[in-house]
Amino acid sequence: TLNAVSSYVKQFLPDNTIFVWDEKPVYKPNIRKETLKEYKGNRSKDSSPHQNNEVIKSILKTMGINSIFPSQLEADDVVAYICREKEGSKVIISVDRDFLQLVSEECTLYDPIRKKYFDYASFEQETGYKNVDEWYTAKCLTGDKSDNVPGIPRFGAASVKKYLADPGYMLDKSQQEIFKRNADIFCLDKYESLPDEKEYYREQLEVKVEASYKEFIDYCKEYSFERILSKKENWYNLFFMKSLYNKLNDIAS
């Protein structure tokens, strides 16, 4: 994970890096399950892939990287909040196609597995849909198997194409109900109707995380991250030089 973060920071050279986790230190039930109780019921309950999360969070903090969490919602919603509330260009690094709905002139999605960019200019070329609205409509029609959200029965690619091409295409009552339910599940602006959730995100983002090269090296020694230690100068230049420069600027001002 740390090497991946390093490679992305080197690739994109951001002014600020935020790590969003899909876990809940302040737990509240996922409100999407109120709409569909089977939502994500197909996901593995195996916690072993997350056993080192606390160590990773601590090390990220020494690198000046803030960790942000949801409470009632999910990591996707936190990312949506950041993209919509923060000014300037943003790059989301994720394989999750749900983030396609956030693509805009200021927001790009980068898939690190396929090494593909999804941006405003190339959206149709990369997705086959003219714009984000078309993509989102198609998703609401067809559902999402990975999230255990069923779509409209027998509504495949041909039906979606016909629906998008014909403004007069009418869904029947049961189809409308499925579409509306899916739109409610998939939308990433639910935080707008949850003031406490929105405030929770804002408070976390306001926390200033100071990078500490000494603490970073101490962690790397403690956990025998020999590969990082062998290239510690590179890590210093990438994460800690900027922090030192910012501190000097603060003093000067």
Predicted regions and their residues:
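Domain-level signal for Mg2+-assisted phosphodiester chemistry and nucleotide/NA-binding surfaces
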Residues: 1-61, 114
